[in-house]
Amino acid sequence: MNASSNVSNVEIANKIASAAALFRKYFPDASVNFSPWENSNNESMQDTIDFAFHFPGWSPLIECRAILLQLRIKNDNNDRVPKLLGIIMRGMIVPSERWRVATIGDWEMTGTHLPQKEQKDNLFLVCKELYKLFSTTSTGNKN
């Protein structure tokens, strides 16, 4: 679901804004889109908070023009902020995916065109810091 559609209270608004700022800390040229989907009311998208980060052009270092960031969440009515279960990032060039990393399992980056080592390391740092950001309610699986 679009990150902009997930804002239901001040705490989640703060987490969403902080997640975008955290990504931009490592990739300052990226602009954030809090509504990457035209229609995010799809039932299958209810368990994600989705962002898109667009770069000014194709970057040979990161091997893409945009990154789709999906935070897999579990909404518990008792918590004001959802639990972060996992993260999926996809490096995109229209119309195809160039690479992907998921924090469920081995945290391996796969794809046809992987980012350079420094950018790859920064993407993993973003994931680790997102778990820290949501740590008050997170069940993350990596130190």
What are these model-derived regions, one by one?
Residues 1-52:
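Charge-rich, low-complexity N-terminal segments
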